[in-house]
Amino acid sequence: MNRFLAFFILAFVSIQIDGLAQQKILNEAIERAEKEGFSGVVLVAEKGEILFEEAMGMRTYENQIVLHEDDIFELASLSKQFTAMMIMICKEKGLLDFDDPLSNYIEVPYPGISIRNLLTHTSGLPDYQSIMDEHWDKSKVAGNPEILEYLREYAPPKSFEPGAKYEYSNTGYVLLASVVEKVTGEDFVELSKAWIFNPLKMKSTGIRALEEKAAVMTFAAGHLKNGDGQFVNANTFHSSDYTVWLGNRKGPGRVSSNVKDLYKWDQALYKEKLVSKKTIEEAFTPFKLDDGFLSYYGFGWEIKPQSPFGKMVMHTGDNPGYKTIIVRYIEENKTIIILNNNAYPDMMRLVEAATLSLGKW
């Protein structure tokens, strides 16, 4: 994110650019991205009003079906903010506390880890995907119970002691989903609908199995370039196989949605529709490491204390053929959401242009 931080310095100087000029910056960036082959949807909003929303590219290249603004994308790691919210709701229901030991709920061979460590990627847990890739029978589909079983059986060492440093951990978010199931006795997928998606009327959002995705006509397939430089379905590549044999995992990914639903989610976080303002503020607070330094990852969100518009929280996602990002300038209620389905390499350039455009409309 160093490029983003450097951009902020420029943005502070440029933020007073004439409004029409700022809109032109975004329009030109969109046009350039489209010429470079970008396929996806971009939404820019401020204080409850959508200022810009545009789709470009293809839902499927094979059938030459054009993308629409309401099309549904894999969110990849943007899913973690929903998993974190499920934990926050559990906390407010009195089912757990953030500083509870993980061992209160889940048996794993890694003592000393708290729920907060899992939320903030400070647990030191090993990567579950590497374990499963080495040992799992890939003719079968694994989910959280199998992942937990293999963590216990093979018990690879931790990277560091809990709280010592930050290291991004998909394993931690698998365990968080399993904690939710343990304390509620409910399925995480169905409970996510009941606690988040249905109350917010996020009708296009869900944690879908592969066959469910195939049945959704408006689902934007992920694409990668083949040896001939043509975009083809990402599922034809060996590197995508894990999305099949880990197809039942819950917590670190698998949520699919569209930009309008994500904007409903964004706006709900200002209005205490799901949890209290106090809990949201804690979610957007850096974690203090054992050495006293701060780690700027909260509960499912990266945190930037300073930006052109004050405090910012954000997250990115990356699955085969998909790149996603949500940026929220929470002091001024400004939002940028970009969902891409052909692995566009320069998403941050679009974010930078959108940020400049938000200075004045």
Model-derived segments and spans:
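Bacterial Sec-dependent N-terminal signal peptides
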Residues: M1-I25
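Short, conserved catalytic-motif segment at the N-terminal edge
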Residues: Q23-F73, L95-D100, A155, W361
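Active-site SXXK
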Residues: V42, G48, I72-D99, Y173-E181, ...
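A short acidic/small-residue loop/turn micro-motif
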Residues: G57-Y61, L246, A343-P345
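Short, well-ordered beta-strand elements
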Residues: M86, M312-H315, I325-N342
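Short, glycine/proline-biased beta-turn/loop segments that scaffold the active-site neighborhood
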Residues: F98-P111, L200
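Short, surface-exposed loop or secondary-structure junction motifs
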Residues: I113-T316
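Short, gly/Ser/Thr-rich active-site loops of penicillin-recognizing serine hydrolases
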Residues: N342-W361
